[in-house]
Design a protein with these regions (language model features):
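Acidic, metal-coordinating catalytic segment for phosphate/diphosphate chemistry
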Residues: 1-26
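A short, flexible beta-alpha/helix-coil linker loop
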Residues: 40-42
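Short, acidic/hydrophobic/Gly-rich beta-strand patch recurrent on exposed beta strands
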Residues: 33-36
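Unchanged
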Residues: 50-137
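Short, solvent-exposed loop/turn segments that connect beta-strands within catalytic domains
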Residues: 24-31, 87-88
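A short gly/proline-enriched turn/hairpin at secondary-structure junctions
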Residues: 44-47
């Protein structure tokens, strides 16, 4: 069986974008924001579908704001992950490192919890291996 390479520009691929959101705590350590989605009972990184005529970067900022309430600034791209979603659709999610600059989390139907964790603890808490791998490949 041939391996299918997913391209972000492929019209049959669902494009998503999100953020690895960080802040520096009072002791100078990096903490990452991860979210809990009750519909899936998972811990993941904030992300969502790229709308038509929306850049992936704008989508990432919008989705992070919608899901976390945080205002962020993009620092750099972190890479993309390709996978098949729960409905059997091909999906490519691209992520950017973002610094939280303000805002406040409010629990909702889509996202009911946000936690700030050390990089090591965030990797342990995340549900999906693809999210864990993305963080493990970074130098925070």
């Amino acid at each position: 069986m041939a391996t299918k390479i997913l391209e972000l520009t492929d019209v049959n691929v669902i494009r998503a974008a999100g953020g690895v959101v960080y802040r520096t705590d009072s002791s100078g350590d990096t903490e990452l924001a991860i979210i809990h989605r009750p519909a899936y009972d998972d811990w993941t990184l904030p992300k969502g579908k790229v709308e038509p005529d929306e850049s992936p970067e704008d989508c990432a900022l919008r989705e992070v704001r919608e899901e976390t309430g945080l205002r962020c600034v993009i620092e750099r791209p972190l890479g993309c992950t390709a996978y098949v979603d729960r409905r059997g659709r091909d999906k490519v999610a691209c992520y950017w490192l973002m610094e939280a600059k303000g805002g406040r989390f409010r629990a909702g139907i889509e996202v009911d919890k946000l936690v700030w964790l050390s990089v090591e603890d965030a990797i342990k808490r995340l549900t999906y291996p693809r999210d864990k791998k993305l963080l493990e490949q970074q130098d925070f």
